[in-house]
Amino acid sequence: MKWPIRGVYFFFEPGENRAKTSEPRVVRIGTHALKFNSKTTLWNRLRQHRGYADQRGNHRGSIFRCHIGTAIINKEKLQDKFPDWKKRSASREVRQKETLMEKRVSNHIGKMPFLFLSVNDANGPSKRSYIEKNSIALLSNFGKIKTSSAVDPPSEDWLGHHCSNENVRLSGLWNHNHVQHEKVHPEFLNTLEKTITQAG
C-alpha cells in the first residue's frame, strides 16, 4: 500500500457506535505538518500515535497517547505508579518505569480502526487544517453529551470519560482543540465531499 505524504485521519473505537445505527462513531480527528518547517508525514504521525512493533511508544510526542494514558490511569487509580505521565519531559529512569503503560496505550490504540483522507497540500495552515477543524466542530458534543441535542454521544462505558482533559470528557472526542462551540463553515461539507471525490 502506498501512503499519501499528507492527509487527515479519523479514528474509531470498539464499542463506540452512532446513536441511531450500528455504525462506528468517529472518536478522534487529526492531521500533521501544520508548521511550515515540519517534515512529518501522515504515516509517521499515525505511527507516533499507535506506537511501534514492540508496543512501546512516546506519549510525550503524541497528545492522543497522553489522553488515552491519563484515562487508563484515572480509571484504574494508578496515579501513584505513574506520577509523571502528564509532564512534558522525563528522565530515562521515569520513561522506563512508564513502559508498561506505554504498551497498554499502544494496545488500546492498536485496536482502533481508522480511515484517512489524502490531502497532499503544502506544509502549514492548509486544507488539511480546515478539514480537521471543521470535522471536530461538527462531531463535538461539548457540553451536550447528556442532553437531547447531543449527536452520536459516547457510550456510558467510553474510556474517555476518565480522561484528565476536560475538553475530551465534555466533547466525546479524543481531541482538545476546536471542540468548544466552534461554528462549522457553511461550505465545509461540500469541500469535504469534493476532496473525497478527488482522492478517489
State where each predicted segment sits:
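GIY-YIG nuclease catalytic motif and its immediate N-terminal context
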Residues: 1-104, 108-200
